[in-house]
Amino acid sequence: MTLMPFRVVQYLSVVLLSFTSLAQQPTPTLTPDQALRQYRESKATTLRDDFGERGRYRDANAALKPPAPGENRVVFFGDSITDIWHLDEYFPGKPYINRGIGGQTTPQMLIRFRQDVIDLHPKVVVILAGTNDIAGNTGPMRLEDIEANYASLAEIARANHILVIFSSVLPVHNYTPRSLNMYAQRSPEKILALNHWLKDYVATHPGCIYLDYFSAMVDDKGLLKRDLAEDGLHPNAAGYKIMAPLAEAAIAQALAAAKP
């Protein structure tokens, strides 16, 4: 057996130690603006080729059968908070369909609303959006622009005899290192203002209901309760356990109100 010269072994040891040292270096922390820029760059091709990401559920929609007679089909429609919600675990046996796409804003949702909601013929659509608009995921958004998109979603749904549930925007927190950018990009004041508008809108529009997640998930500082999300935005299992019965109650309310 040929032994490796001592100097070669020594050199390789130094190289390996160097790589180990580099691997252990802390990842540079991005500012909120840098994180947002990085997100936009990562989505640039997708947003250019299919801004609404209509292709995401194309095959699933094509395979979906029409609702059975008497079926109370519900579409949960929104961004990542909906996308990562395992509906079958929280609503077993219910004809509930998930059409969330992570990172989306209301202008993107408008583009895919026909394919992912109208054409599926639900009785109810549960819309949870707004947080990424406030963050500026697809560009700066004024509150009045977000509100106009919400109104358009509701009008399209009601024109197709679909009941609308507007979910409140969830609070955010800054209690963990992972949450700092999420919080900095999402003004609590804007979240409150948008929720106030949503509540006022449904009060004057028949066929629309307000689903208040916010009040059940906010702490005494006006932030998302620490134990409901690690990154300050996306609910964990404890968060979804709070949300599920609230959603179920709102769906029951919508269906009951629609009965002749």
Task: Please give the residue ranges for each predicted region.
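Short hydrophobic segments within beta-strands
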Residues: F77-G78, S167
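N-terminal secretory targeting modules
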Residues: M1-V75, D83, L87, L120, ...
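Active-site metal-binding loops of divalent metal-dependent hydrolases
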Residues: S80, I101, T131-N132
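Alpha-helical cap/lid subdomain in secreted, periplasmic
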Residues: E89-P95, L110-P260
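Conserved beta-strand elements of the Class I
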Residues: V75-F77, I97
